[in-house]
Design a protein with these regions (language model features):
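C-terminal motif of bacterial Sec signal peptides marking the signal peptidase cleavage site
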Residues: 13-16
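A sequence/structural signal for flexible, mid-protein segments enriched
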Residues: 18-277
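Sec-dependent signal peptide recognition
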Residues: 2-9
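Enrichment for repetitive, rod-forming helical segments
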Residues: 9-10, 192
């Protein structure tokens, strides 16, 4: 009985010592904007796309219009500002002047001002290392050809985005034309890291093409942070190619709080190959 009394007194003490504690915690800032775009060392009009976030993969993102968008870089002690202009026929797409050309190894900042908010992203423009075009396609059992994605020049390449632009529209009408088309564009990524070879395809369908096809192979060399963005993006999605419309919470970004996506600065190289029988 005495033991029970001790237990009862102990419980009463615990109850009397209860105190309501208001925990302080930081909420993630609201996601206001998705940024998708890059500049290169080509002299051309470069595109930056601004949209509102969506919650479902198949939702169509709403373009963000009326933003003030600029690209900044240092030149000596001065900061040079290059304002972008919103495309009249494509709301939410902002263009540099057609003469704008990035410089290798220079850091570039994207500055966005919209409805009282300001967002910033920074990336370094990497040099694009030359690549070999031999053996980039192989003949299939059906007599047609397909891209040789496992070719060593790609699997062992530096971090880059690659595009195969295939065109055999100049060949006779009797030539192979699936779905009535004689063109295709394929994308893949070489994203080397410590634990994987980092070769990612942008789809699972094999595209066949005939001898005589013209292949324009484009390479965009990317920074380590751009590669990290793509790794996390590919890890979070069932990647089939296309525009990144939905961003998960843990996807890497170089945008300041309130925005996601990526602003990239890339070195660019391209070469043309004609498929020989």
């Amino acid at each position: 009985m005495q033991k029970f009394s001790y237990i009862l007194i102990f419980l009463l003490i615990l109850v009397s010592c209860e105190e309501i504690i208001d925990w302080d915690y930081e909420e993630n800032p609201p996601l206001l904007m998705v940024v998708d775009g890059k500049i290169t060392d080509q002299a051309k009009a470069h595109k930056i796309r601004l949209t509102k976030p969506v919650s479902e993969l198949n939702d169509i993102p709403e373009p963000i219009t009326g933003a003030e968008v600029s690209i900044l870089f240092k030149q000596g002690n001065d900061t040079i500002e290059n304002p972008l202009t919103e495309a009249l026929d494509e709301p939410g797409t902002y263009l540099t002047d057609s003469s704008f050309q990035g410089i290798t190894y220079k850091y570039y900042a994207l500055q966005i001002k919209h409805e009282g908010y300001e967002f910033l992203a920074i990336d370094n423009l990497r040099e694009s290392v030359p690549f070999e075009t031999a053996n980039i396609y192989t003949q299939a059992d059906n007599g047609l050809y397909n891209v040789n994605f496992i070719y060593g020049a790609f699997a062992n390449a530096d971090a880059a985005i690659w595009y195969f632009n295939l065109d055999w529209s100049h060949l006779p009408d009797t030539v192979y034309a699936p779905n009535g088309t004689k063109k295709a564009r394929l994308a893949f990524y070489s994203l080397p890291s410590i634990d994987v070879n980092g070769l990612f395809l942008s789809g699972y369908e094999t595209v066949y093409f005939p001898a005589g096809t013209k292949i324009i192979l484009e390479k965009y060399s990317i920074s380590e942070s751009y590669a990290e963005f793509l790794r996390t993006m590919l890890a979070e999605t069932d990647w089939r190619g296309g525009v990144f419309d939905t961003y998960r919470a843990n996807t890497f970004t170089n945008l300041s709080d309130g925005a996601t996506g990526f602003f990239g600065a890339c070195g660019y190289l391209a070469d043309t190959v004609v498929v020989q029988p």
